[in-house]
UniProtKB/Swiss-Prot annotation:
Residues 35-54 have a biased composition (Low complexity). Glycans are attached at N9. It comes from Xenopus laevis (African clawed frog). The gene is tmem39b. Residues 25-54 are annotated as: Disordered. Belongs to the TMEM39 family. The chain crosses the membrane at residues 76-96, 114-134, 158-182, 187-207, 281-301, 414-434, 440-460. Its main location: endoplasmic reticulum. May protect the cells against DNA damage caused by exposure to the cold-warming stress and facilitates tissue damage repair during the recovery phase. Keywords: Endoplasmic reticulum, Glycoprotein, Membrane, Transmembrane, Transmembrane helix. This is Transmembrane protein 39B. It holds the Pfam family Tmp39.
Protein backbone atom coordinates (compact mmCIF):
# COMPACT_ATOMS: atom_id res chain seq x y z
CA UNK A 1 0.00 0.00 0.00
CA UNK A 2 1.38 3.43 -0.93
CA UNK A 3 2.83 5.22 2.04
CA UNK A 4 2.46 2.17 4.22
CA UNK A 5 5.13 0.24 6.05
CA UNK A 6 5.76 -3.32 5.06
CA UNK A 7 5.88 -5.77 7.86
CA UNK A 8 8.49 -8.45 8.35
CA UNK A 9 8.83 -11.27 5.92
CA UNK A 10 6.00 -13.76 6.30
CA UNK A 11 6.79 -17.26 7.43
CA UNK A 12 6.70 -19.84 4.66
CA UNK A 13 4.32 -22.58 5.85
CA UNK A 14 5.09 -26.06 4.67
CA UNK A 15 2.58 -28.10 2.68
CA UNK A 16 3.67 -31.56 3.80
CA UNK A 17 1.06 -34.28 4.30
CA UNK A 18 0.01 -35.37 7.75
CA UNK A 19 1.52 -38.83 7.49
CA UNK A 20 4.48 -40.58 6.01
CA UNK A 21 3.34 -42.30 2.81
CA UNK A 22 5.97 -44.96 3.22
CA UNK A 23 4.65 -46.22 6.56
CA UNK A 24 0.93 -45.47 6.64
CA UNK A 25 -0.10 -47.82 3.88
CA UNK A 26 1.04 -51.01 5.55
CA UNK A 27 -0.19 -50.41 9.06
CA UNK A 28 -2.10 -53.19 10.70
CA UNK A 29 -3.27 -54.15 14.14
CA UNK A 30 0.20 -53.96 15.58
CA UNK A 31 0.99 -50.32 14.93
CA UNK A 32 -0.84 -47.04 14.74
CA UNK A 33 0.24 -44.54 12.08
CA UNK A 34 0.91 -41.33 13.99
CA UNK A 35 1.27 -37.93 12.45
CA UNK A 36 4.89 -37.01 13.01
CA UNK A 37 7.07 -34.23 11.82
CA UNK A 38 4.21 -31.78 11.39
CA UNK A 39 5.12 -28.34 12.61
CA UNK A 40 2.30 -26.28 11.22
CA UNK A 41 0.59 -23.29 12.70
CA UNK A 42 -2.77 -21.95 11.64
CA UNK A 43 -3.18 -18.29 11.04
CA UNK A 44 -5.79 -16.35 12.90
CA UNK A 45 -9.21 -17.31 11.57
CA UNK A 46 -11.66 -16.05 14.14
CA UNK A 47 -13.50 -14.14 11.45
CA UNK A 48 -14.12 -17.23 9.31
CA UNK A 49 -15.17 -19.66 12.02
CA UNK A 50 -12.65 -22.32 10.87
CA UNK A 51 -9.67 -23.36 12.92
CA UNK A 52 -6.77 -25.69 12.33
CA UNK A 53 -6.62 -28.63 14.77
CA UNK A 54 -4.00 -28.40 17.48
CA UNK A 55 -0.87 -30.48 17.31
CA UNK A 56 -2.18 -32.94 19.88
CA UNK A 57 -5.23 -33.57 17.72
CA UNK A 58 -3.06 -34.43 14.73
CA UNK A 59 -2.33 -37.92 16.04
CA UNK A 60 -4.62 -40.73 14.97
CA UNK A 61 -6.18 -42.33 18.03
CA UNK A 62 -7.41 -45.92 17.70
CA UNK A 63 -11.16 -46.44 17.53
CA UNK A 64 -13.02 -48.25 20.28
CA UNK A 65 -16.01 -50.17 19.00
CA UNK A 66 -19.03 -50.75 21.17
CA UNK A 67 -20.01 -54.34 21.84
CA UNK A 68 -23.66 -55.14 21.29
CA UNK A 69 -25.54 -58.08 22.80
CA UNK A 70 -26.48 -61.09 20.71
CA UNK A 71 -30.16 -60.61 20.00
CA UNK A 72 -32.33 -63.69 19.40
CA UNK A 73 -33.11 -64.33 15.75
CA UNK A 74 -35.46 -66.74 14.04
CA UNK A 75 -34.04 -69.70 12.20
CA UNK A 76 -34.02 -69.30 8.45
CA UNK A 77 -36.58 -72.02 7.79
CA UNK A 78 -38.87 -70.70 10.52
CA UNK A 79 -38.62 -67.18 9.13
CA UNK A 80 -39.55 -68.33 5.63
CA UNK A 81 -42.51 -70.23 7.06
CA UNK A 82 -43.74 -67.12 8.90
CA UNK A 83 -43.33 -64.97 5.79
CA UNK A 84 -45.24 -67.48 3.68
CA UNK A 85 -48.00 -67.59 6.29
CA UNK A 86 -48.33 -63.78 6.16
CA UNK A 87 -48.57 -63.91 2.36
CA UNK A 88 -51.23 -66.62 2.55
CA UNK A 89 -53.28 -64.47 4.93
CA UNK A 90 -53.05 -61.51 2.55
CA UNK A 91 -54.04 -63.71 -0.40
CA UNK A 92 -56.96 -65.16 1.56
CA UNK A 93 -58.36 -61.78 2.54
CA UNK A 94 -58.03 -60.59 -1.05
CA UNK A 95 -60.07 -63.54 -2.28
CA UNK A 96 -62.67 -62.62 0.33
CA UNK A 97 -62.77 -59.13 -1.16
CA UNK A 98 -63.25 -60.49 -4.69
CA UNK A 99 -65.57 -63.49 -4.20
CA UNK A 100 -67.60 -62.45 -1.15
CA UNK A 101 -71.29 -63.29 -1.02
CA UNK A 102 -74.38 -62.05 0.77
CA UNK A 103 -74.89 -65.25 2.71
CA UNK A 104 -76.88 -63.50 5.47
CA UNK A 105 -79.72 -62.51 3.11
CA UNK A 106 -83.08 -64.31 3.43
CA UNK A 107 -84.02 -66.96 0.83
CA UNK A 108 -86.14 -64.44 -1.11
CA UNK A 109 -82.94 -62.75 -2.25
CA UNK A 110 -80.25 -64.48 -4.35
CA UNK A 111 -79.41 -67.34 -2.01
CA UNK A 112 -75.92 -68.37 -1.01
CA UNK A 113 -74.97 -70.98 1.53
CA UNK A 114 -71.27 -70.07 1.70
CA UNK A 115 -69.39 -66.86 2.39
CA UNK A 116 -67.44 -67.13 -0.91
CA UNK A 117 -68.43 -67.96 -4.46
CA UNK A 118 -66.16 -70.95 -4.74
CA UNK A 119 -67.47 -71.88 -8.19
CA UNK A 120 -66.07 -68.62 -9.58
CA UNK A 121 -62.54 -69.15 -8.25
CA UNK A 122 -59.94 -70.31 -10.76
CA UNK A 123 -58.00 -72.83 -8.71
CA UNK A 124 -55.24 -73.07 -11.32
CA UNK A 125 -54.43 -69.40 -10.80
CA UNK A 126 -54.66 -69.93 -7.05
CA UNK A 127 -52.24 -72.88 -7.21
CA UNK A 128 -49.76 -70.98 -9.35
CA UNK A 129 -49.93 -67.94 -7.08
CA UNK A 130 -49.39 -70.07 -3.99
CA UNK A 131 -46.31 -71.72 -5.53
CA UNK A 132 -44.81 -68.34 -6.42
CA UNK A 133 -45.43 -67.05 -2.90
CA UNK A 134 -43.87 -70.22 -1.46
CA UNK A 135 -40.73 -70.05 -3.63
CA UNK A 136 -38.52 -68.96 -0.73
CA UNK A 137 -39.96 -71.56 1.63
CA UNK A 138 -39.47 -74.32 -0.95
CA UNK A 139 -35.88 -73.24 -1.48
CA UNK A 140 -35.29 -73.17 2.28
CA UNK A 141 -36.70 -76.69 2.71
CA UNK A 142 -34.60 -78.07 -0.13
CA UNK A 143 -31.47 -76.38 1.15
CA UNK A 144 -32.11 -77.58 4.70
CA UNK A 145 -32.60 -81.12 3.44
CA UNK A 146 -29.43 -80.89 1.34
CA UNK A 147 -27.26 -79.75 4.25
CA UNK A 148 -27.90 -82.63 6.58
CA UNK A 149 -24.20 -83.25 7.22
CA UNK A 150 -23.11 -86.57 8.67
CA UNK A 151 -26.20 -88.61 9.38
CA UNK A 152 -27.27 -92.21 9.52
CA UNK A 153 -28.68 -94.13 6.60
CA UNK A 154 -32.36 -93.72 7.63
CA UNK A 155 -31.90 -89.98 8.10
CA UNK A 156 -30.18 -89.67 4.72
CA UNK A 157 -33.00 -91.56 3.04
CA UNK A 158 -35.56 -89.36 4.79
CA UNK A 159 -33.79 -86.19 3.61
CA UNK A 160 -33.57 -87.47 0.06
CA UNK A 161 -37.24 -88.46 0.12
CA UNK A 162 -38.23 -85.06 1.50
CA UNK A 163 -36.24 -83.25 -1.15
CA UNK A 164 -37.69 -85.44 -3.89
CA UNK A 165 -41.26 -85.06 -2.63
CA UNK A 166 -41.06 -81.27 -2.34
CA UNK A 167 -39.47 -80.75 -5.75
CA UNK A 168 -41.68 -83.29 -7.50
CA UNK A 169 -44.90 -82.02 -5.97
CA UNK A 170 -44.04 -78.40 -6.68
CA UNK A 171 -42.95 -79.09 -10.25
CA UNK A 172 -45.99 -81.23 -11.05
CA UNK A 173 -48.44 -78.70 -9.61
CA UNK A 174 -46.74 -75.82 -11.41
CA UNK A 175 -46.67 -77.56 -14.80
CA UNK A 176 -50.26 -78.78 -14.47
CA UNK A 177 -51.50 -75.28 -13.62
CA UNK A 178 -49.61 -73.74 -16.54
CA UNK A 179 -51.00 -76.29 -19.02
CA UNK A 180 -54.58 -75.82 -17.83
CA UNK A 181 -54.21 -72.04 -17.93
CA UNK A 182 -53.01 -72.25 -21.54
CA UNK A 183 -56.20 -74.10 -22.41
CA UNK A 184 -58.61 -71.72 -20.70
CA UNK A 185 -56.99 -68.28 -21.06
CA UNK A 186 -55.45 -66.25 -23.81
CA UNK A 187 -51.74 -65.82 -24.31
CA UNK A 188 -52.02 -62.15 -23.34
CA UNK A 189 -53.43 -63.06 -19.93
CA UNK A 190 -50.59 -65.51 -19.35
CA UNK A 191 -48.05 -62.80 -20.17
CA UNK A 192 -49.43 -60.93 -17.18
CA UNK A 193 -48.06 -63.72 -14.98
CA UNK A 194 -44.55 -63.33 -16.41
CA UNK A 195 -44.51 -59.55 -16.34
CA UNK A 196 -42.47 -59.19 -13.10
CA UNK A 197 -39.79 -61.61 -14.30
CA UNK A 198 -39.44 -59.68 -17.54
CA UNK A 199 -38.94 -56.47 -15.61
CA UNK A 200 -36.15 -57.99 -13.49
CA UNK A 201 -33.71 -58.34 -16.37
CA UNK A 202 -33.25 -54.60 -17.07
CA UNK A 203 -33.52 -53.80 -13.38
CA UNK A 204 -30.96 -56.22 -12.01
CA UNK A 205 -28.21 -56.07 -14.65
CA UNK A 206 -26.28 -58.66 -12.68
CA UNK A 207 -23.01 -60.14 -13.78
CA UNK A 208 -21.90 -61.74 -10.50
CA UNK A 209 -23.19 -62.56 -7.08
CA UNK A 210 -20.91 -60.56 -4.79
CA UNK A 211 -22.33 -62.04 -1.62
CA UNK A 212 -20.85 -65.47 -2.21
CA UNK A 213 -17.19 -64.76 -1.37
CA UNK A 214 -16.31 -63.82 2.20
CA UNK A 215 -14.48 -60.75 3.33
CA UNK A 216 -11.30 -62.73 3.59
CA UNK A 217 -11.56 -63.40 -0.14
CA UNK A 218 -12.62 -59.98 -1.33
CA UNK A 219 -12.38 -59.60 -5.12
CA UNK A 220 -9.65 -57.28 -6.28
CA UNK A 221 -9.97 -54.57 -8.88
CA UNK A 222 -8.96 -56.86 -11.74
CA UNK A 223 -11.57 -59.44 -10.77
CA UNK A 224 -14.27 -56.82 -10.48
CA UNK A 225 -13.41 -55.43 -13.90
CA UNK A 226 -13.54 -58.87 -15.47
CA UNK A 227 -16.90 -59.51 -13.79
CA UNK A 228 -18.33 -56.30 -15.19
CA UNK A 229 -17.09 -57.19 -18.68
CA UNK A 230 -18.63 -60.65 -18.48
CA UNK A 231 -21.48 -61.69 -20.68
CA UNK A 232 -24.98 -60.79 -19.52
CA UNK A 233 -27.06 -62.89 -21.81
CA UNK A 234 -30.63 -63.80 -21.12
CA UNK A 235 -29.98 -67.22 -19.58
CA UNK A 236 -27.18 -65.87 -17.41
CA UNK A 237 -29.44 -63.18 -15.97
CA UNK A 238 -32.25 -65.67 -15.45
CA UNK A 239 -29.85 -67.86 -13.49
CA UNK A 240 -29.10 -64.96 -11.17
CA UNK A 241 -32.81 -64.18 -10.85
CA UNK A 242 -33.52 -67.72 -9.67
CA UNK A 243 -30.57 -67.61 -7.29
CA UNK A 244 -31.72 -64.18 -6.16
CA UNK A 245 -35.09 -65.52 -5.01
CA UNK A 246 -33.64 -68.55 -3.27
CA UNK A 247 -33.10 -67.87 0.44
CA UNK A 248 -29.51 -67.79 1.63
CA UNK A 249 -28.47 -68.80 5.14
CA UNK A 250 -24.80 -67.92 4.71
CA UNK A 251 -22.94 -66.28 7.60
CA UNK A 252 -22.63 -62.53 7.73
CA UNK A 253 -19.39 -60.84 6.70
CA UNK A 254 -16.86 -60.03 9.40
CA UNK A 255 -15.18 -56.75 10.17
CA UNK A 256 -11.45 -56.66 9.41
CA UNK A 257 -10.74 -53.66 11.71
CA UNK A 258 -7.53 -52.90 9.81
CA UNK A 259 -5.59 -49.63 9.72
CA UNK A 260 -4.46 -49.68 6.12
CA UNK A 261 -6.33 -47.07 4.05
CA UNK A 262 -6.37 -49.28 0.96
CA UNK A 263 -7.79 -52.24 2.88
CA UNK A 264 -10.41 -50.06 4.55
CA UNK A 265 -11.58 -48.70 1.20
CA UNK A 266 -11.64 -52.22 -0.25
CA UNK A 267 -13.69 -53.47 2.68
CA UNK A 268 -16.14 -50.59 2.29
CA UNK A 269 -16.43 -51.30 -1.43
CA UNK A 270 -17.29 -54.93 -0.78
CA UNK A 271 -19.77 -54.06 1.99
CA UNK A 272 -21.41 -51.52 -0.30
CA UNK A 273 -21.92 -54.19 -2.96
CA UNK A 274 -23.25 -56.62 -0.37
CA UNK A 275 -25.64 -54.04 1.07
CA UNK A 276 -26.93 -53.06 -2.37
CA UNK A 277 -27.55 -56.71 -3.16
CA UNK A 278 -29.52 -57.22 0.03
CA UNK A 279 -31.62 -54.10 -0.57
CA UNK A 280 -32.28 -55.20 -4.14
CA UNK A 281 -33.39 -58.59 -2.86
CA UNK A 282 -35.77 -56.94 -0.41
CA UNK A 283 -37.31 -54.67 -3.03
CA UNK A 284 -37.77 -57.29 -5.72
CA UNK A 285 -39.06 -59.99 -3.38
CA UNK A 286 -41.58 -57.65 -1.77
CA UNK A 287 -42.79 -56.29 -5.12
CA UNK A 288 -43.17 -59.78 -6.57
CA UNK A 289 -45.12 -61.04 -3.56
CA UNK A 290 -47.39 -57.98 -3.53
CA UNK A 291 -47.92 -58.28 -7.29
CA UNK A 292 -49.09 -61.89 -7.06
CA UNK A 293 -51.22 -61.22 -4.01
CA UNK A 294 -53.01 -58.07 -5.18
CA UNK A 295 -52.96 -57.93 -9.00
CA UNK A 296 -52.84 -61.49 -10.36
CA UNK A 297 -56.17 -62.64 -8.79
CA UNK A 298 -58.11 -59.64 -10.13
CA UNK A 299 -56.66 -60.01 -13.63
CA UNK A 300 -58.28 -63.44 -14.05
CA UNK A 301 -61.64 -62.37 -12.65
CA UNK A 302 -64.57 -62.64 -15.05
CA UNK A 303 -65.87 -59.42 -16.54
CA UNK A 304 -69.21 -59.86 -14.79
CA UNK A 305 -67.58 -60.09 -11.37
CA UNK A 306 -67.39 -56.89 -9.30
CA UNK A 307 -64.50 -56.17 -6.94
CA UNK A 308 -63.11 -53.16 -5.12
CA UNK A 309 -60.20 -51.84 -7.20
CA UNK A 310 -59.16 -49.28 -4.60
CA UNK A 311 -58.87 -51.99 -1.97
CA UNK A 312 -56.70 -54.08 -4.31
CA UNK A 313 -54.28 -51.16 -4.78
CA UNK A 314 -54.28 -50.49 -1.06
CA UNK A 315 -53.57 -54.15 -0.36
CA UNK A 316 -50.67 -54.05 -2.81
CA UNK A 317 -49.08 -51.16 -0.92
CA UNK A 318 -49.64 -52.79 2.46
CA UNK A 319 -48.22 -56.16 1.42
CA UNK A 320 -45.21 -54.63 -0.31
CA UNK A 321 -44.41 -52.40 2.67
CA UNK A 322 -44.93 -55.16 5.23
CA UNK A 323 -42.81 -57.63 3.27
CA UNK A 324 -40.09 -55.03 2.79
CA UNK A 325 -39.87 -54.35 6.51
CA UNK A 326 -39.89 -58.04 7.45
CA UNK A 327 -37.25 -58.97 4.87
CA UNK A 328 -35.08 -55.98 5.73
CA UNK A 329 -35.15 -56.92 9.39
CA UNK A 330 -34.08 -60.46 8.47
CA UNK A 331 -31.42 -59.61 5.87
CA UNK A 332 -30.04 -56.58 7.75
CA UNK A 333 -29.89 -57.77 11.37
CA UNK A 334 -28.34 -55.81 14.20
CA UNK A 335 -24.93 -57.49 13.81
CA UNK A 336 -24.83 -56.57 10.12
CA UNK A 337 -25.77 -52.93 10.78
CA UNK A 338 -23.09 -52.78 13.49
CA UNK A 339 -20.58 -54.13 10.97
CA UNK A 340 -21.49 -51.36 8.52
CA UNK A 341 -21.22 -48.81 11.31
CA UNK A 342 -17.70 -49.96 12.19
CA UNK A 343 -16.64 -49.79 8.55
CA UNK A 344 -18.10 -46.28 8.25
CA UNK A 345 -16.23 -45.19 11.38
CA UNK A 346 -12.96 -46.42 9.86
CA UNK A 347 -13.75 -44.82 6.49
CA UNK A 348 -14.49 -41.32 7.72
CA UNK A 349 -15.97 -38.47 5.74
CA UNK A 350 -14.99 -35.17 4.12
CA UNK A 351 -16.98 -31.96 4.04
CA UNK A 352 -16.49 -29.57 1.16
CA UNK A 353 -15.74 -26.02 2.33
CA UNK A 354 -15.50 -22.69 0.59
CA UNK A 355 -11.87 -21.94 -0.32
CA UNK A 356 -12.42 -18.26 0.50
CA UNK A 357 -13.13 -19.12 4.15
CA UNK A 358 -9.89 -21.04 4.60
CA UNK A 359 -7.48 -19.19 2.34
CA UNK A 360 -5.30 -18.20 5.30
CA UNK A 361 -5.21 -21.70 6.80
CA UNK A 362 -2.87 -24.61 6.33
CA UNK A 363 -4.05 -26.89 3.51
CA UNK A 364 -2.46 -30.22 2.68
CA UNK A 365 -2.47 -32.16 -0.56
CA UNK A 366 -4.63 -35.24 -0.13
CA UNK A 367 -2.79 -38.55 -0.46
CA UNK A 368 -4.48 -41.93 -0.58
CA UNK A 369 -1.82 -43.61 1.58
CA UNK A 370 -2.49 -41.28 4.50
CA UNK A 371 -4.90 -41.56 7.39
CA UNK A 372 -6.10 -38.04 8.13
CA UNK A 373 -7.24 -36.92 11.62
CA UNK A 374 -10.34 -34.91 12.33
CA UNK A 375 -10.44 -31.24 11.38
CA UNK A 376 -7.63 -31.29 8.80
CA UNK A 377 -8.03 -29.32 5.57
CA UNK A 378 -6.89 -30.96 2.34
CA UNK A 379 -6.88 -30.08 -1.34
CA UNK A 380 -8.31 -32.57 -3.82
CA UNK A 381 -9.35 -31.95 -7.43
CA UNK A 382 -9.03 -28.17 -7.01
CA UNK A 383 -11.42 -28.23 -4.04
CA UNK A 384 -10.88 -27.90 -0.31
CA UNK A 385 -12.29 -30.48 2.11
CA UNK A 386 -12.40 -30.71 5.88
CA UNK A 387 -12.05 -34.02 7.71
CA UNK A 388 -15.21 -34.85 9.63
CA UNK A 389 -14.71 -38.41 10.87
CA UNK A 390 -12.61 -39.66 13.75
CA UNK A 391 -9.98 -40.41 11.16
CA UNK A 392 -10.52 -40.36 7.45
CA UNK A 393 -9.34 -42.51 4.56
CA UNK A 394 -12.27 -41.86 2.22
CA UNK A 395 -11.72 -40.24 -1.16
CA UNK A 396 -12.98 -36.65 -0.78
CA UNK A 397 -14.58 -36.48 -4.22
CA UNK A 398 -16.20 -39.94 -4.02
CA UNK A 399 -19.92 -39.45 -3.42
CA UNK A 400 -20.44 -43.13 -2.59
CA UNK A 401 -18.03 -42.85 0.34
CA UNK A 402 -19.91 -39.80 1.60
CA UNK A 403 -23.25 -41.59 1.35
CA UNK A 404 -21.87 -44.70 3.06
CA UNK A 405 -20.58 -42.69 6.02
CA UNK A 406 -23.72 -40.56 6.23
CA UNK A 407 -26.07 -43.53 6.25
CA UNK A 408 -24.13 -45.83 8.58
CA UNK A 409 -22.43 -43.35 10.90
CA UNK A 410 -25.47 -43.82 13.13
CA UNK A 411 -25.76 -47.57 13.89
CA UNK A 412 -29.46 -47.23 14.69
CA UNK A 413 -30.46 -45.43 11.50
CA UNK A 414 -31.71 -48.53 9.66
CA UNK A 415 -33.56 -49.78 12.73
CA UNK A 416 -35.15 -46.37 13.29
CA UNK A 417 -36.39 -46.26 9.70
CA UNK A 418 -37.87 -49.76 9.91
CA UNK A 419 -39.53 -49.08 13.26
CA UNK A 420 -41.03 -45.83 11.98
CA UNK A 421 -42.37 -47.44 8.79
CA UNK A 422 -43.90 -50.36 10.67
CA UNK A 423 -45.41 -48.05 13.28
CA UNK A 424 -46.97 -45.80 10.63
CA UNK A 425 -48.35 -48.84 8.80
CA UNK A 426 -49.89 -50.28 11.97
CA UNK A 427 -51.39 -46.90 12.88
CA UNK A 428 -52.95 -46.59 9.42
CA UNK A 429 -54.34 -50.12 9.57
CA UNK A 430 -55.83 -49.50 13.00
CA UNK A 431 -57.42 -46.30 11.76
CA UNK A 432 -58.83 -48.12 8.72
CA UNK A 433 -60.09 -50.91 10.96
CA UNK A 434 -61.95 -48.51 13.23
CA UNK A 435 -63.45 -46.57 10.34
CA UNK A 436 -64.34 -49.53 8.11
CA UNK A 437 -68.00 -50.30 7.48
CA UNK A 438 -67.68 -53.43 5.35
CA UNK A 439 -67.36 -56.80 6.98
CA UNK A 440 -64.70 -58.12 4.59
CA UNK A 441 -62.52 -55.05 5.20
CA UNK A 442 -62.79 -55.57 8.94
CA UNK A 443 -61.78 -59.22 8.68
CA UNK A 444 -58.96 -58.42 6.27
CA UNK A 445 -57.39 -55.69 8.39
CA UNK A 446 -57.74 -57.69 11.59
CA UNK A 447 -55.91 -60.67 10.09
CA UNK A 448 -53.16 -58.63 8.44
CA UNK A 449 -52.47 -56.76 11.67
CA UNK A 450 -51.34 -59.92 13.46
CA UNK A 451 -48.28 -60.32 11.27
CA UNK A 452 -47.40 -56.65 11.60
CA UNK A 453 -47.73 -56.80 15.38
CA UNK A 454 -45.10 -59.52 15.60
CA UNK A 455 -42.70 -57.66 13.29
CA UNK A 456 -43.20 -54.42 15.22
CA UNK A 457 -42.56 -56.21 18.51
CA UNK A 458 -39.19 -57.52 17.31
CA UNK A 459 -38.22 -54.13 15.89
CA UNK A 460 -39.15 -52.31 19.08
CA UNK A 461 -37.31 -54.87 21.21
CA UNK A 462 -34.14 -54.52 19.15
CA UNK A 463 -34.40 -50.73 19.18
CA UNK A 464 -34.68 -50.54 22.97
CA UNK A 465 -31.86 -53.01 23.62
CA UNK A 466 -29.46 -51.56 21.07
CA UNK A 467 -30.30 -48.00 22.08
CA UNK A 468 -29.20 -48.74 25.63
CA UNK A 469 -26.13 -50.64 24.44
CA UNK A 470 -24.90 -47.79 22.24
CA UNK A 471 -25.68 -45.18 24.88
CA UNK A 472 -23.20 -46.71 27.32
CA UNK A 473 -19.52 -45.97 27.23
CA UNK A 474 -17.83 -47.72 24.32
CA UNK A 475 -16.21 -50.98 25.35
CA UNK A 476 -13.08 -51.95 23.39
CA UNK A 477 -13.22 -55.13 21.32
Amino acid sequence: MAGGRRGPNRTSYCRTPLCDPGSAGGAAHGGMPSVGGVRSRARSSSSTGLSSPPLAAQTVVPLRHCKIPDLPADRHLLFELQLFFCHLIALFVHYINIYKTVWWYPPSHPPSHTSLNFHLIDFNVLTLTTIVLARRLIGAIVREASQGGKSSMPQSLLLVATRFAVLTGTGWSFCRSIILLFRTHSFFNLLFLCYPFGMYIPFLQLGWDFRRPGLSHMPNTRDLASMDRGSKDYLHVLQHILRHHMPSAEPLPTHACCLSPDLIRSEVHYLKLDFNWRVREVLLSSMLSAYYVAFVPVWFVKSTQYYDKCWSCELFLQVSLSTSVILTQHLLPAQYCDLLHKAAAHLGCWQKVDPALCSNMLQHSWMEECMWPQGVLVKHNKNVYKAVGHYNVAIPSDVSHFRFHFFFSNPLRVLNILTTLEGVLIFYQLYSLLSSEKWHHTISLALILFGNYYAFFKLLRDRIVLGKAYSYTAVPD
